[in-house]
Amino acid sequence: MAGGVGARVVVGRHIYGNLYGCDPQILRDESALITIIKEATKIANAMLLSVGSYRFGPNGGLTVFAIVAESHISIHTWPEYGFATVDVYTCGDHTDPKAAFDYIVSKLKPQKVEAFFGDRSMYKE
Amino acid sequence: MAGGVGARVVVGRHIYGNLYGCDPQILRDESALITIIKEATKIANAMLLSVGSYRFGPNGGLTVFAIVAESHISIHTWPEYGFATVDVYTCGDHTDPKAAFDYIVSKLKPQKVEAFFGDRSMYKE
């Protein structure tokens, strides 16, 4: 988890991905996605503050969102294409955003995953 | 705004940044940040569904979050370090996430900005 130089004042790690060929049934299942994001919060070792979900468009697409004390986790879905995007962004050495990301991916059952890492740390200058 | 090959089925653009040396007064001003994120939603040409804000820790740090029909916008702040992170992730050719990101940055008055682009599009395979 590289990036920057010097000591980190704030440790922030953001794992995000674009998921192709997911199970469309799960992508339109609001309560399943809420359960998944809550479980992911625990796996990340983050403290859940709030979960919200919103359905958009005529095809059952969903946004499911968790605000955690350590930042946020989101899932956006396009069931009509089997496509979803996932963000797990948590702060603090005590958190494990990669494990939470991998858990969400395992539940959405994609055929292909494009995963990326964003360093959201603050470095001492 | 590169990435992938072939036609885009879903257009998703995610601009995110780490902001150093921001005005600490603004970073702990919940109502100011809510006003800023609402205005950013308009500038992005996105449709606002919900705004939430959460204060965390003893130093007045805030998370301000906007769910839009086209994905999400977030601001996380650490006033004690003058540090903030900003994400503007919107879907659709009609949106302008870069303009919204630049607007938020202008309001937080950082001395240094690390900005990144994440392609969240789905490409035809």
Curated annotation (Swiss-Prot), chains A, B:
Record field: transmembrane: none
Gene3D superfamilies reported for this sequence: 3.30.160.750, S-adenosylmethionine decarboxylase domain (3.30.360.110)
Intrachain S-S bonds: none
Any GO MF annotation of the entry: adenosylmethionine decarboxylase activity
Gene Ontology BP annotations: spermidine biosynthetic process
Cofactor binding note: Binds 1 pyruvoyl group covalently per subunit.
Modification Pyruvic acid (Ser), positions: 71
Family: Belongs to the prokaryotic AdoMetDC family. Type 1 subfamily.
UniProt-annotated catalytic positions: 71 (schiff-base intermediate with substrate), 76 (proton acceptor), 91 (proton donor)
Protein name, entry field: S-adenosylmethionine decarboxylase proenzyme
Cited InterPro entries: AdoMetDC_C, AdoMetDC_fam_prok, AdoMetDC_N, S-AdoMet_deCO2ase_core, S-AdoMet_deCOase_pro-enz
Names of required cofactors: pyruvate
Gene Ontology cellular component annotations, sorted alphabetically: cytosol
Function: Catalyzes the decarboxylation of S-adenosylmethionine to S-adenosylmethioninamine (dcAdoMet), the propylamine donor required for the synthesis of the polyamines spermine and spermidine from the diamine putrescine.
Keywords for the protein's UniProt record, in alphabetical order: Autocatalytic cleavage, Decarboxylase, Lyase, Polyamine biosynthesis, Pyruvate, S-adenosyl-L-methionine, Schiff base, Spermidine biosynthesis, Zymogen
